[in-house]
Amino acid sequence: MSYEEKLAKLITHHSLNLKKGDVVQIKAETSAEPLVKAMYKEIIKLGAYPFLRLFIPESQEYMAKYASDEQLSYLPEFDIKQAEIMTAYIYIDSTINTKSLTNADHSKIALMRKTAMPVREIMNKRELEGKFRWSLCPYPNQSMAQDAEMSLDEYTAFVYEACKLNEDDPIAAWKKVEAEQEAIAKRMTGTKWLHIKGKDTDLKLNVEGRIWENCCGYRNMPDGEVFTSPVENSAEGTILFDIPTTYNGVEAKNVFLRFEKGKVVEARAEKGQDYLHKMLDMDDGSRFAGEIAFGLNDNIKIPTKNILFDEKIGKSMHLAIGASYQEVGGKNISALHWDLIKDMKNGGTVEADGVLVYKDGKHIL
């Protein structure tokens, strides 16, 4: 069975658990055609209704470069209609130029994200009602491999292992992950305060009443994290994110944040500082913490400049600035959701209500 066929089966049968009658949108760059075909075929075989939303690699670049604010603010009615009727959504990450937006007008990128918010709000609402589910998965290419500083063969093998496609039964492998991570989610349930310590890091977060979600392949693929959304006005202290991340193709390195009453009041970065400041000023919610999570996928050991993988790095934590997750109790609304990652292997600790629960990347259960 090919990579495309194995991944299509994993996404449709495990991540989305598609059934006869489901209405499924596949959104992807044209460069992902082989995987799109495999997904389309598998969806039909399940008795569901696939429809395609393919786009050229340059589409966002052209919008940022040539579109007026009026054009960038236009939201087609059919986008709203699709969000209202589809029961499942697959986004295939196959960007052939991950740097295409590096020199774009970032205020225009922010406007595009704001314009699309009504669609995301509809999908979020329907997901909470149990009427909609989604999945994000990768299709390896030269650009992604180059970002990860690997050959295409090496990168494809890396993706295989991260997604457990190298296992005889990938679905069974993810079910095992689900059981292992559930112990962590249960341990964290009921916690009121987290205290995160490490290099240039001393941060407290209130997570009282919030749900800890076990992420084991039902949305993202690859997966491997346990997360929640902190109480919006609770973050106090400092944190250094020593693993580089990219957002809309722009890299930020060694991001340092200081929070007061939940809000970022100081932000520095060794690289990408101006961009960081623009993103923090995107809207009223963009300076608040929307997520705190443990990365648990030990098949992902190094950063690849792709957040789909990097936020799951084993023995790491990540905090997202911007939008929180309603399904776990989050209330922060923003067009921004930027995951920033911290290596916890060497001296990182987490206390839950004063009890040490995590040290050097390992949970103490």
Where are these regions (language model features)?
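Short aromatic-centered micro-motifs
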Residues: 196, 258, 350
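Oxyanion-binding "anion nests"
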Residues: 222-267
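Dual-mode signal for accessory low-complexity, basic/Gly-rich regions
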Residues: 266-330, 350
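Extended hydrophobic packing segments that form well-structured cores
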Residues: 336-365
